[in-house]
From Swiss-Prot:
It catalyses: N(6)-dimethylallyladenosine(37) in tRNA + (sulfur carrier)-SH + AH2 + 2 S-adenosyl-L-methionine = 2-methylsulfanyl-N(6)-dimethylallyladenosine(37) in tRNA + (sulfur carrier)-H + 5'-deoxyadenosine + L-methionine + A + S-adenosyl-L-homocysteine + 2 H(+). Monomer. Its cofactor is [4Fe-4S] cluster. SUPFAM superfamilies: Radical SAM enzymes (SSF102114). It comes from Vibrio campbellii (strain ATCC BAA-1116). This is tRNA-2-methylthio-N(6)-dimethylallyladenosine synthase. It is found in: Cytoplasm.
Length: 474
């Protein structure tokens, strides 16, 4: 009987990616199979996030529930990973001595040996160090779980925004070698993946070492990923305005695999607040990037992150943010009230804003963005959209769920054999969080792929000079 593993994941897409790698690693090393039932599990892993308020208390509440299971089943192994583990490792060890393994985002590759060690030595076993990019060298071959996949291309952040814990919990920016990234994506493409989402805390800061000692830029990597057979869509998360350079914008002009949707966090529209946040750009500089992007790709839609109620934020500062939101015409946003993160400079900034004012500002911001998003959705009504079918609809298992380039979910009627394929649908209805469509054509009617024989390829590239000497270009 196989051993069972439960992984509970909180936080960003990087954490989702890390959790999938934990599952692959423990399956390859020890045969663990995933379960969603805590009572069945032999190993319980909590992959934590420290971005939001009360993250630590949330962790201890969950651990308390798992302690009850461990009291009944003493052999179960409890592990805590992620950013809270890095930030609060010693505190977890003191407050929850029943935890067996404590590991950080950069040491998850050691999980099999740490679990084994915890079963023979006195627990807990803890490793929350930052061993550069070593973890990727120790992970098994990636396993595709559908037509889309996340691929981490870099780790950490070197920006040190005053409100953010990421540099302290994931370390400074380190890029994976270019060949490693391309090989992982090629493996996923061989398993049927059609869309990849390149991940990093500042993904456009990617500077990947190449085998010849040169450095691969993010723009170069995007074009290389687009050239991998089978990969038809590329997304990336999350980018930073400071490194959103013209060479990246140029990729939008000549690489159709790169979707017409971008998440580019700005946090505030006030230059004064941006300075206090240690964000090295102004609102005008941000809008300049957007103008260049829309010149390169007129139909691109933009989402962003916003922090409301940052210490010292005045009504004028907030109105500057609202003006930026309307000027850029954001399609989507992730917006939150500022919550101080222990150990960050902003945690010590005085703030005299009432909670009521913060909530009112957040509501106004979210309503404005939601209104803009609904307008974009309504513009799609009666249009044909090419969508990637991800699986059964979450609302009706007899229907299919697909995703547009601009990141909207479309539910429509279709057969299960369309899962993993591109189809064209006509948008027939618009809802707050999804669209409804009718199937127009399937992939076999699209001519997405053209098969050319070697003879045809040579004939296509054959050139003769004036002497009749033939040459062939690759």
């Amino acid at each position: 009987m196989s051993k069972k593993l439960l992984i509970k994941t909180w936080g960003c897409q990087m954490n989702e990616y890390d959790s999938s790698k934990m599952a692959d690693l423990l399956n390859a090393a020890n045969g663990y199979e995933l379960t969603e039932e805590p009572e069945e599990a032999d190993v319980l892993l909590l992959n934590t996030c420290s971005i939001r308020e009360k993250a630590q208390e949330k962790v201890f509440h969950q651990l308390g529930r798992w302690k009850t299971l461990k009291d009944k089943k003493p052999g179960v192994v409890i592990g805590v990973g992620g950013c809270v583990a890095t930030q609060e490792g010693d505190h977890i060890r003191q407050r929850a001595p029943y935890v067996d393994v404590i590991f950080g985002p950069q040491t998850l590759h050691r999980l099999p040996e740490m679990i084994k060690q915890s079963q023979s030595d006195e627990a807990p076993v803890m490793d929350i160090s930052f061993p550069e990019i070593e973890k990727f060298d120790r992970l098994p071959e990636p396993r595709a779980e559908g037509a889309t996949a996340f691929v981490s291309i870099m780790e950490g952040c070197s920006k040190y925004c005053t409100y953010c814990v990421v540099p302290y919990t994931r370390g400074e920016e380190v890029s994976r070698p270019m060949d490693d990234v391309l090989f992982e994506i090629a493996q996923l493409a061989d398993q049927g993946v059609r869309e990849v989402n390149l991940l990093g805390q500042n993904v456009n800061a990617y500077r990947g070492p190449m085998h010849d000692g040169e450095i691969c830029s993010f723009a170069e990597l995007l074009r290389l990923v687009a050239s991998i057979d089978g990969i038809d869509r590329i997304r990336f998360t999350t980018s930073h305005p400071l490194e959103f350079t013209d060479d990246i914008i140029a990729v939008y002009e000549d690489t159709p695999e790169l979707v017409s949707f971008l998440h580019l966090p700005v946090q505030s529209g006030s230059d004064r607040v941006l300075t206090m946040m240690k964000r090295p750009h102004t609102g005008i500089e941000y809008k300049s990037i957007i103008r260049k992007l829309r010149k390169a790709r007129p139909d691109i839609q933009i989402s962003s992150d916003f922090i409301v109620g940052f210490p010292g934020e005045t009504d004028k500062d907030f109105q500057d943010t609202m003006k930026l939101i309307k000027d850029v015409d954001f399609d989507m946003s992730f917006s939150f009230i500022f919550s101080p993160r222990p150990g960050t400079p902003a945690a010590d900034y005085p703030c005299d804003l009432s909670e009521q004012v913060k909530k009112e500002r957040l509501y106004e911001l979210q309503q404005t963005v939601n209104t803009q998003a609904m307008r974009y959705s309504r513009q799609m009504l009666d249009t044909e959209q090419r969508v990637l079918v991800e699986g059964p609809s979450k609302k009706n298992l007899m229907e299919l769920r697909a995703r547009t380039e601009n990141n909207r979910v479309v539910n429509f009627e279709g057969s299960a054999d369309l899962i993993g394929q591109f189809v064209d649908v006509k948008i027939t209805d618009v809802f707050a969080n999804s669209l409804r469509g009718e199937l127009v054509r399937t992939e076999k009617d699209m001519d997405l792929r053209s098969v050319i024989s070697p003879t045809q390829m040579m004939a296509k590239t054959r050139r003769e000079d004036e002497l009749g000497v033939a040459t062939f270009t690759p």
